Amino acid sequence: ILSEYDIILVQEVRDADLSAVNELMNQLNSAGGHPYSFVISIPLGRTSYKEQYLFIYRSDMVSVLGSYYYDDGCESCGTDTFSREPFIVKFSSPTTQVQEFVLVPLHSEPSHAAQEIDALYDVYTDVVNKWRTNDIIFLGDFNADCSYVTSSQWPSIRLRSLRACEWLIPDSADTTVADTTDCAYDRIVACGTALRQDIEPGSATVNNFEKKFHLQTKDALAVSDHFPVEVTLKAQ
C-alpha cells in the first residue's frame, strides 16, 4: 500500500525510539522499488498516551524544505486547542505543476473533533503568515462524521466555508474498514488556487485495499481500521 505513493501520512504511530519505523523503512526500501525517506514528529498528546505524525516520502520525487509544530497554547494549563497539534511540513516537488506545498496533518480527539477541525482555520492563517503560501493540504483522521461531527455542526466550522479550500473527500465517503460503520472520518482538504488547479480531476478517493487485494474483513482490519484517502497532483 505504501509503495503506491510518493508521500504518505501515517498516524497513531507510537514508537518513540523509532525501532518500528526504521524496520518499516528497511522493508519498504528493500522491496527494490523506489527510495523512501521519512520525517516524524515528537510524541504528541496531553496525557501519557502520545502519538506521532509520520510522513514517508519518495526521496527521488520530493524533498522536505522545512517543518514546525503549530503552537496551540499551553498544554499544562489545559488551554491548548489540539490533542495532537499539527506537525506542519513543507515539501519541494519538482515534477508537479505546484513545486512547493505544505502538508498539515491532524488526528483529532473524537470528543472535540468539531472544535479541532474548526481550529484548522487558525493553522491555515498561521502557515500563510509564516511561509507566505496558501498551497496547503490538510489531511488525516479528522473524525469528521457520524457521532463526532454532526450535520448541525458543519456550518460553524470555519475551514469548511473557507473559499480558498476544497474538501476533496465528501461526507458520503466511508473511510472505515468495519462493515458496521459508514463514516467519512478521514479527509483531504486542498487550499490555494495553484494547488487546487494542480489536482488531477476525480483522483481524490478512498483506497479500499480490502477490495483491491480481495481480503476478508478480519485480515483488512489487521492492516488498519481505516482505509487510506488519496489524491494525485498533475505532473508538469
Segments and roles (model prediction):
Residues 1-236:
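Divalent cation-coordinating acidic motifs and surrounding scaffolds
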